[in-house]
Regions:
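Domain-level signature for soluble enzymes in the chorismate/prephenate branch of the shikimate pathway
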Residues: 1-110
Length: 110
């Protein structure tokens, strides 16, 4: 594709680049905020799991999560494997947080 077909001039291209990067920075902030919010729920989740005598790892819940991610990947036309890898990291973060809380509770430090 010819460069001239995309933009009127370099000013327009630079402006779009700048604005797009600013928007990505905002989105990155929102993503990190939501991951933090999700991780903070680990305390409530582990307390409920302790009360219900459940393990930290819940195979059925993770299946639901990954089924939703797979469907969303298709709906949003995003590589499913990449989204699943991202969710693996996010769920690991939550499980690690739950394990840490459980360890502190057992040691009487929470």
């Amino acid at each position: 594709m010819n460069k001239k077909n995309l933009f009127k001039d370099e000013y327009e291209a630079n402006n779009i680049l700048k604005n797009s990067r600013e928007e990505i920075d905002k989105i990155d902030y929102e993503i990190i905020h939501l991951i933090s919010k999700r991780t903070l729920l680990a305390k409530d989740i582990i307390n409920a799991k302790i009360f219900l005598k459940m393990d930290i790892y819940d195979k059925n819940r993770e299946k639901v999560i990954y089924d939703k991610v797979s469907k969303l990947a298709i709906d949003k036309n995003i590589d499913k494997n990449i989204l699943i890898n991202i969710m693996n990291l996010i769920t690991k973060l939550s499980k690690d947080q739950q394990k840490e809380i459980l360890k502190r509770k057992k040691n009487g430090k929470y």
